[in-house]
Amino acid sequence: MKNRAVRLAALATFASLALPGLATADSTRLELDKLRYVTVYDVAQQAVLAVDTDGRPLTALLRIAKGQFVPPHGAGGPLRVLTIVSGTLSWGDGHTVDEAAERSFGPGSVIVLPAGGGEHWAAARHDDVLLQIVVLRAGKLAPEAAAQLTR
């Protein structure tokens, strides 16, 4: 038993010496202006932060400049979770745009788009907007989040 404990301690020491990058990895703040943005929906800028094993986006940032409107899109997509990072997002559901039916979401707001959901639109009517989009193709919401969904 004592011999086994010595071997485990030696193995742990060797592993910490052999993998110093893993043992001391620091977190990194991304510089958003250094990311590669592409134009989407003709008016917004998207930067992909993470991809799945097939190269499909898992996490992305979406910038919408003040005064820009993203037309209805997104029907039938996977489960998506959007977090407003900055600005006030004007949001509407459906194929027909109705500004009177728009809702406003400020920084820290979270919007859930269910898998297979309908179209929606977005606008930056008051200021620039930055969103983080997380795509959950194989995942699902936690029970407390799922309980808040309305159909």
Model-identified regions with their sequence ranges:
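Short acidic-glycine-tyrosine-enriched beta hairpin
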Residues: 53-54, 95-117
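Glycine- and acidic-residue-biased ligand/ion/polar-headgroup-sensing regions
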Residues: 65-67, 75-96
